[in-house]
Design a protein with these regions (language model features):
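C-terminal non-catalytic accessory extensions
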Residues: 211-322
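Non-catalytic, C-terminal membrane-associated alpha-helical segments of glycosyltransferases
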Residues: 182-231
Length: 322
């Protein structure tokens, strides 16, 4: 498929651009990332899920290896493709402090462009849902909330209110002005379009802060239809609905404009920096074998145990004594 798309772009001159979703080991496929970029991939969604090996094992994400995250993300950077990653909050070992700590580690050590957060959700029909049902655990009866954007089950180490709060804190922690500047600097230094990064950051930050919804469920203008209501809710009078909708829309658009202008000032600051193309930080530093000893990503006991396990497996794979 990629070969044919490359021909259409490079020989036929068709301007094909698209987004793909990949796993965290896609960089191990020979030439896959390079071909994807040539075929027209401009953005890639990666299910990062978590940086805690125990959480990944609990989510049955054995293919997600924290030792491969930087290699994979830097490979997409080299191909000048913008990355956005999904990150799940609410694994059994999670606490508000641990979640925010891990997000700061990601900011510092992983070259992720956009990060979007989801609640760990026992989707109806899944093994997790069945286990909770058989155990008699509380789960929200409103099926409309099972969209990964609501807390719908209990958590062993957080109350529902704490879980909700850290969900919103996670967005605010990642999308600070300081880190947005870092994202834009990394984009310029690695050949990714800073303008596209700014557009997406504005969208993500505004949907959460202004609309109060997940970015995948919204945009820059919220459309509401008076007669489209959830079952059981009465229709509002046109004399109430339309004036309220107009005022709400105008207020929100002013907030969108303010947000864009604030972020645009960060963008201009970065673009005016004469040394912008020479920017370097820990996250976009080339991978070395020694980093597992120095990076905070690998410093927890769980991470160290995982690194030891991976090293032992590599030795066995190469016929060396473990």
């Amino acid at each position: 498929i990629l070969d044919r798309l490359i021909i259409l772009r490079e020989t036929e001159g068709l301007k094909i651009n698209f987004i793909i979703q990949v796993d965290t080991l896609c960089h191990r496929l020979p030439n896959f990332i390079e071909k994807a970029a040539r075929a027209g991939v401009k953005r890639v969604f990666i299910g990062l899920e978590n940086i805690n090996p125990d959480n990944l094992l609990g989510a049955k994400k054995q293919q997600n290896k924290i030792t491969e995250y930087r290699k994979m993300l830097l490979a997409w950077k080299k191909a000048r493709v913008l990355t956005y990653c999904g990150y799940i909050l609410g694994f059994p070992n999670d606490t508000p402090e641990a979640i925010l700590h891990d997000i700061r580690v990601i900011q510092k050590e992983l070259p992720v462009d956009l990060l979007e957060f989801f609640y760990l959700t026992p989707l109806p029909g899944s093994e997790d849902h069945r286990k909770l049902h058989e155990a008699g655990s509380w789960m929200d009866s409103d099926m409309n909330k099972y969209d990964l954007n609501h807390a719908v089950a209990g958590h062993p180490r957080m109350t529902i209110e704490e879980w909700k709060k850290v969900y919103h804190d996670a967005w605010e922690t990642y999308y600070t002005d300081e880190h947005i500047e870092t994202i834009l600097r990394r984009a310029i230094a690695t050949g990714v379009s800073p303008g596209k990064a700014l557009f997406l950051i504005t969208w993500f930050k505004g949907c959460i802060g202004i609309e109060g919804i997940h970015p995948l469920e919204g945009g820059f203008l919220r459309m509401k239809v008076r007669r489209t209501r959830r079952s059981g809710l009465r229709l509002e009078s046109p004399l109430i609905f339309y004036p309220k909708y107009l005022i709400e829309t105008l207020r929100k658009q002013m907030r969108w404009i303010d947000l864009y202008l604030d972020l645009r000032s960060i963008y201009r600051k970065v673009k005016r920096d004469p040394s912008r193309k020479d920017y370097m930080d820990l996250a976009i530093t080339p991978v070395t074998d020694e980093e597992v000893e120095t990076m905070e990503l690998f410093k927890s006991d769980v991470a160290q145990a995982f690194v030891t396990k991976i090293r032992r497996a590599e030795k066995v794979r190469h016929g060396e004594p473990a």
